Amino acid sequence: MKFKVNGHEVFASTGGRPFDKKKPLIIFVHGSGLTHMTWVLQTRYFAFHGYNSLAVDLPGHGLSSGESLKSIEEMADWVSDVIDAVGHKEASLVGHSQGCLVTVECTSRYPNKIKTLSLMGGAGAIPMNPELLSLAENNDPKAVDLMMDWAHGPAGHFGGHPVPGLYHINTGTMLAKSRTIENTLGVDFRACDNYKNGFEAAKKIKCPTLSILATDDKMCPVKEGKKLASLIDGSQVDIIDNCGHMMLLEEADRVLTVLKKFITT
């Protein structure tokens, strides 16, 4: 599905079903340097069970036009604009990694527009490794290779992809290298490194919130996810064992089970 936000064309996957303004809206926000494709194993379920699923490509990513937004705050405002652009007054938000920073900030800024908030592999702050940041900003493909190595748990390194013939790390690498690294991953990493408002934003959130964390997450460890969740009144926490930061791909079925129980009840 394509539509315009602030004069630029936006692409969003609808999970294989036509968009219907009468159905409740769920917006999925991807992590640094990635695209809507990371959500392919979650969006389809909701699209076929009474929801509008929109897995968006952030500006400058995937199939969306424009330049990458340079701050988490800009991205948060953009998500709010997406809700308006598709003719809805509210949405449930689902974010992964950087997408958690974006959706936390968005929910704190626009509380009347957010019905529920689901965070995967989230933290209140995501300071970047200086070497990784430098590699990404200098368009070095090693940045993607390192990110994918750290982002997957031990099991994710050995296979287990639900689609026969695919490999978790190669799939993620392909997505991250689909656009110029310095203009996507480099910009996103810098935005994460600069963002300092996550904990204060979390304190303002009043809508039902779910945090899905993973025991083998090296990028946003469980303790950081719990710290963020503790600041959100009534936040639910679910921890997935033997899984890394890319839980939405490594353990797609387990993540979907938790997510659909939270959103649909």
Go through the PLM ranges and name each one.
Residues 3-15, 40-48, 52-98, 257:
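Active-site loop/oxyanion-hole signature of alpha/beta-hydrolase fold enzymes
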Residues 31-34, 97:
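Active-site glycine-rich loops that stabilize anionic/oxyanionic intermediates
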Residues 205, 211-213, 217:
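Short beta-strand/loop motif that positions the catalytic acidic residue
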Residues 218-224:
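Conserved alpha/beta-hydrolase "acid-adjacent" motif
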